[in-house]
Structure formats: structure tokens, C-alpha cells
Amino acid sequence: MRRQGLQQLQRGSRACPDHGGGPVEEHDLLATSWTWAGREPVRERIRAVADAGFAGLALALDDLHEVRATTGFADLRRMLDDAGVVWVQLGTLGEWWSTANRADQDADRGVVLEAAATLAAWQVVVRADHSVPGAPPGRMAEAWDRLAMQAEGVGARLVLEPEPWSNLGTVERASRFVAAGHPNGGLLLDAMHALRGGSTFSSIAQGVVPATLAAVELSDGLLHTPNGMTLAEESRDGRYLPGSGAWDLPGFIRTARGLGYAEPWGVEVRTPALRARPLQDALRVAAAATRAVLDAADAHGAPPAPAMPTSAAPTSAVDFDRPRPPVVPDAVLRRRTGPATSA
């Protein structure tokens, strides 16, 4: 059984006593490569991801090359199994359509496909063309289909992450590209890239082919890109904790669900303040913030919580203070008892 299939069998719901004991959905979180990046050894970082409550993680190309040259992918799989990680995402591959720098591209593709086979990876992520002018998407179609077939051969799905500064700059356009290609292709819907690319909840709901939606990543952000910062720089250093920015993430989540998306929810957060924290603390904060936003999306349209009582609460024995006799000043006592006499 593949990793994600096992997790789907194990997933359930927990009771919520504050709302009459009704079920509250348990959500799988996936830490993207930036979210759990650090200088610690891979084994320690994987353990930190699992301890923070994540069920999945994304491995970057640098990590894959390092593991292949040192411990090997079989040992990495044991680390993931021991930590209980069940969703594994690999990438991100670039220039997969290009005939230039073939040696580097072939090396990256080879390490990703080898890792996907050994790790029973869920997905392989690729990006579009960042060059100016970008390659016409039609020229990329054949390479996309070929890579999608290669990913299928090792049991993973190929997913495209559209970025606003690429030749497939909107999720709607990227979805059309994916839908026209190999059925093993999919779309990664990233909150920052989608909203900064000009998409709205309505355009996503109407313009994304439901069958293409394969992954979702959550982060929060400011209302506008800060002055002096490019979109790419904001994407790298301005990804705030879910719920701490200006975006309607519960609405974004409901839009993705309306297209049929279920689990897991990628968490891609990266700011100077988060990077300054110990990795385990940063991961715990990121997981808690994301779960709060998902819970808010779950609660949309649900019956309101019971009203708080309006009558005064009775005084409990713990709060009860025993009456104390009044304190009488010494001068008053002397007047009452008269002057002291000596023997």
C-alpha cells in the first residue's frame, strides 16, 4: 500500500466537547522544503517535522543529492518510516523542457526519479519557465508528457507549480496546460502565487479544472507586495504564518475543497523572524497556525456555539471568604478598657 493510502485509512476525526461532542476533522499537514529548511542533519530535521505534528514533507533537490551521496535513499526511507511521515513530495525541478545544460537537468531528474521510486513518493513538483521571454507553452508539452510518464513509472504524480513571474503565471492558465497533457499531470495551487498572480476565489473555482488539482500550499501575506520587493523575493521571504496576514485563507481553503481537494495541506511559511527561531519551535508554531485556519474553514456554515449563560454564577466554596472580625485600633481599645494599672 502506498504511503498516502495508508494515511487515508488512518485519518479520522476527533470529538469537540465545546460544541456538543460533534466531530472535528483531523487534517494532514505537509511541511514544504522551505518550512523545514535548516543546517541540522536531515535525520534531526525529519524528527522535528514529525514531532510538530506534520504527516508529510517535501524534499528539495539539495537534500536529495546530499542523501544520495551519503546515506542513500534506503536509509532515508527508514528515517521517514520511523518518524511516521506518509506524504513525500520531491522537487522542485526546473528547465525540464530545455535542451540546454542537459547534464545538470538529467542529473536532477535522475536523482528525483530514483528517490521517488525508493521513497514511494506522492508527487514530483516542477516549475515553469522563468526566463524572459519564456518558452511558448506548446513547446513544453511534449517534455511535460514524457516527464509525467516517467513519474508515473515510479508511482508518483507530476505536479506543476505556476508562479506569477513565469510563462504560466496564473493557476487558470497552468490548469489548462495540465489538462491538455498526460493524465498523470497535476496542478499545485499555492495561495501566494495564486493571489499575487491576480486570481480570485471565483476565477479559481471557474478556471481550474477539478481533475487537475493535485496539491495545495498555504501561507499568509500582506495586502500588497512591500515596496522595493519583487514577487519572487516576497515569495521567498514574505510568507507569513496562516492567519497572521491579510488574506482570507479559510475562503481559499473552501475554494480548493469546492474543486474536490481533500488532503494534505502544504504549509509554506518563511520570514526572517521564523528563520531566527529554533527549527522545532518554528515548525510547531506553523502547524498550530495552519490548523487554526483549517478549523475556521471547517466551521464555516456550522451551527453557532451555545450562548454563554447570562445569570450570575453562584459563589463556589473555593471563592468563599470567611468573614473576619473588624480590626480595632489600639487607641480605641485603650479607651474601652481604661488606663493600664501597675501592681
Language model segments and positions:
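Active-site acidic/histidine proton-transfer and metal-coordination neighborhood
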Residues: Q10, A15, R47, D81-D82, ...
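Short, acidic/polar
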Residues: G38-V49, A103-A115, G198-Q206, L249
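Boundary/entry segment of secreted carbohydrate-active catalytic domains
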Residues: V24-E40
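A short, acidic, flexible beta-alpha connecting loop/helix-capping segment that sits on the rim
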Residues: W36, G266-D281
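C-terminal helical cap(s) of enzyme catalytic domains, especially alpha/beta-barrels
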Residues: R277-A299
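Conserved, mostly hydrophobic/aromatic
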Residues: V49, L57, L80, A116, ...
